[in-house]
Amino acid sequence: MSKLNMTPREIVAYLDEYIIGQKEAKKSIAIAFRNRYRRLQLEKSLQEEITPKNILMIGSTGVGKTEIARRIAKIMELPFVKVEASKYTEVGFVGRDVESMVRDLVNNSVLLVENEHKEKLKDKIEEAVVEKIAKKLLPPLPNGVSEEKKQEYANSLLKMQQRIVQGELDSREIEIEVRKKSIEIDSNVPPEILRVQENLIKVFHKEQDKVKKTLSVKEAKEALKAEISDTLLDSEAIKMEGLKRAESSGVIFIDEIDKIAVSSKEGSRQDPSKEGVQRDLLPIVEGSVVNTKYGSIKTEHILFIAAGAFHLSKPSDLIPELQGRFPLRVELENLTEEIMYMILTQTKTSIIKQYQALLQVEGVGIAFEDDAIKELAKLSYNANQKSEDIGARRLHTTIEKVLEDISFEAEDYLGQKVTITKELVQSKLEDLVADENLVKYIL
């Protein structure tokens, strides 16, 4: 069931579990996502008139721009795609054209809908798989047998199915027929070429062609699950629903938008295709029709969230028409030493919890003293100040450095609980951070 009806307060509360600070950014994005729900409650004629208010997020790398958008799209089960503006080229140049981001969104949307339909049919699919395997393991019943024999066979089949479900026969081998693996199609090529590719595949690689394979029961379960899913699912309905959902509630996150801004300071040294990419992007953000392999999609109701650091350029360096299409602007705060500490201690799946869980797999307990966590936050913050500011990502590199030896020699610590102290953190990191020339080694 979709969680599109979450209130802005609920959205912000959810984000607070994973992202520290950035209240204004969370608030703006929460309202934008809530408006998606509000629009869908209106009459059809009015829905068409209301377009989303696109957002421009301004902030350094690692402060939570992508994470905010990604987390909301995930919890609300919306079609979402993250792209980097710098990867696109102007029409006529070699590279990806901007329309491919819409095609990627539609692909993700169809996959999202397909997974939902599979979940609904999960029990039915598993029953069909188990029944098919059981009939392979049991010799077939000869014709003309008595009702008593038929009942005995039915009982044996039921017992066999129970054993398969419990995994008792996972290592047994059986021969089954499976479809030939389909050829992957590149979704980044224009729709016209996609159709040619699909037609060629139908000619040279018929879907109904099957091959016999000897697999273990465990492997056969997975192979048959995919095949039976395709049989039970209404692929046409899934495609149509995926297309509709991408059109009405899709979200495209465009990172590094500042990389295609033409700075007035740089002048003639700028890449001439940057402005071309902006002009190609403009009709998609304004609202146009893009052809995909699933059909045409209108883009005027897709929510676009652009983000960039804008260190070498300003938002005003974007072409005026594109600026006007991102009416909501949010500036994200740089991370302080205190926020670094809170990221390590207060987030639901903090980096510390992640490393503790990873090493627990090896039977090694890890405990961090509070002073050690504060020192990690302090040294990570100092490293950001002295070198390139990569925000919270710096914490990954510093913790990795501190735990490097323990991770490598995990078997030596089996059954032990290792305490990470302030002194240990300092011994691993302070020499590197103190020397500005060596700070690059912990990037």
Curated annotation (Swiss-Prot):
One of its GO terms (cellular component) is HslUV protease complex. The keyword ATP-binding applies. Coiled coil: none annotated. InterPro entries: AAA+_ATPase, ATP-dep_Clp_protease_ClpX, ATPase_AAA_core, Clp_ATPase_C, HslU, P-loop_NTPase. ATP binds at residues 20, 62-67, 255, 321, 393. It is found in: Cytoplasm. Keywords: ATP-binding, Chaperone, Cytoplasm, Nucleotide-binding, Stress response. GO terms for biological process: protein unfolding; proteolysis involved in protein catabolic process. GO terms for molecular function: ATP binding; ATP hydrolysis activity; peptidase activity; proteasome-activating activity. A double ring-shaped homohexamer of HslV is capped on each side by a ring-shaped HslU homohexamer. The assembly of the HslU/HslV complex is dependent on binding of ATP. Belongs to the ClpX chaperone family. HslU subfamily. NCBIfam families: hslU, PRK05201.1. ATPase subunit of a proteasome-like degradation complex; this subunit has chaperone activity. The binding of ATP and its subsequent hydrolysis by HslU are essential for unfolding of protein substrates subsequently hydrolyzed by HslV. HslU recognizes the N-terminal part of its protein substrates and unfolds these before they are guided to HslV for hydrolysis. PANTHER family: ATP-DEPENDENT CLP PROTEASE ATP-BINDING SUBUNIT CLPX-LIKE, MITOCHONDRIAL-RELATED (PTHR48102), ATP-DEPENDENT PROTEASE ATPASE SUBUNIT HSLU (PTHR48102:SF3). This is ATP-dependent protease ATPase subunit HslU. The lineage of its organism: Bacteria, Pseudomonadati, Campylobacterota, Epsilonproteobacteria, Campylobacterales.
